[in-house]
Amino acid sequence: MLFNQIASNKRKTIVLLIVFFMLLAAIGAAVGYLWLDSLVGGMAIALIIGFIYAFSMIFQSTNIVMAMNNAKEITVDEMPDYYHIVEDMAMVAQIPMPRVYVIDDPSLNAFATGSSPQNAAVAATTGLLAIMNREELEGVIGHEVSHIRNYDIRISTIAVALASAVTLISSIGGRMMWFGGGRSRRSNDNEGGGYLQIILLIFSLLAIILAPLAASLVQLAISRQREYLADASSVELTRNPQGMIRALQKLEQSQPMAHSVDNASAALYINDPKKKSGLKHLFYTHPPIADRIRRLEQV
């Protein structure tokens, strides 16, 4: 059951990334049709921008992410119990020892970052370290180490980059639509144009307007799938599903983080740091904890 769940989540994430690139191609085609008279040319430019964004984000420094979240690096002498749990989980997962950080915040939360296991880091809040017992903390750290081992952070980073690329291209297209005249000006030379031109024009306008929203939804879906996979992988590392389940139950009762967390960082945490309510599951950065517990109970 555990390995089937891991394989299923990996397949779903691949599908979501394919959808992301299709969305990027669609918005590129829309802008290309309106301003370059070339669907293919617009698609090519959009995909190139997407790849540039993705690679630049992959090599972004871990220090920047930690600074954005007010995290402080610690040594084994400062917090030996926490440090040794990270060390143990990394050893079981057969990855290099990540750098270890702590966030001075009373809420219960943790996250991992880095483009690969070789330059990864783990951070936990002081609230988490104070409330969780060893088995529960092993479950949480196992979850974060699983993100590193499974290259989840790289996938999440690519998703952020592609969403940013879609938003950029859509913004450019929108500005050109308002200030440039675009194809509508050239279309005056082609009276009539036929139904195909009208359909393509409508498609292009809708793509420019709706693509950023669609990109955000795909990004959130990728984040949710990664959380399910990391939960399952943590149990694989600790061989203790009850420890992870009890940790999730405590996380469910946690308050939002005291310091402000930007939207890009929110998806990295094991628990939604903003604790938004009143929204449909479609707009959550994380799957409902009750669903995560239910899946672990089936292991």
Curated annotation (Swiss-Prot):
GO terms of biological process kind: proteolysis
Recorded topology in the membrane: Multi-pass membrane protein
Active-site residues (renumbered): 144
UniProt entry tagged with the keyword Lipoprotein: no
InterPro entries: HtpX_protease, Pept_M48_protease_HtpX, Peptidase_M48
GO CC, any one term: plasma membrane
Chief place of localization: membrane
EC number: 3.4.24.-
Residues that span the membrane, as ranges: 14-34, 39-59, 158-178, 198-218
Cofactors that this protein relies on: Zn(2+)
Family affiliation: Belongs to the peptidase M48B family.
Protein name in the entry: Protease HtpX homolog
Gene label: htpX
